[in-house]
Amino acid sequence: MFSIIIIASVILLITTVVMFLASILSKKALIDREKSSPFECGFDPKSSSRLPFSLRFFLITIIFLIFDVEIALILPMIIILKYSNIMIWTITSIIFILILLIGLYHEWNQGMLNWSN
């Protein structure tokens, strides 16, 4: 039993040394400035931070976030179905989905879902 632990330790040590040597030998001498800079959604981090930002992109993001939270609220309703009255569950679900559909209709009617504007 003790010999198995020693053999596993030696294999681990050899593997670690080989990986360390491979990483040292494979490094490039010149590190590219663009490759080492952080990437943030296509924005250049080295330029001015006061660039114009698309309000439409921001609003689409907020709409997505709202509907994503609403989906997270809908999913537990299936689990609640086992423990609650079917009539109360149905009425609650219909009201919740109607509120979602009214919100979606309002966003559509206001033109927030049209990307071409």
From Swiss-Prot:
Swiss-Prot/TrEMBL keywords: Electron transport, Membrane, Mitochondrion, NAD, Respiratory chain, Translocase, Transmembrane, Transmembrane helix, Transport, Ubiquinone
EC number: 7.1.1.2
Pfam families, A to Z: Oxidored_q4 (PF00507)
Source species, domain of life: Eukaryota
GO CC aspect terms: mitochondrial membrane; respiratory chain complex I
Main function: Core subunit of the mitochondrial membrane respiratory chain NADH dehydrogenase (Complex I) that is believed to belong to the minimal assembly required for catalysis. Complex I functions in the transfer of electrons from NADH to the respiratory chain. The immediate electron acceptor for the enzyme is believed to be ubiquinone.
PANTHER family, per the entry: NADH-UBIQUINONE OXIDOREDUCTASE CHAIN 3
Family: Belongs to the complex I subunit 3 family.
Name recorded for this polypeptide: NADH-ubiquinone oxidoreductase chain 3
Organism: Drosophila yakuba (Fruit fly)
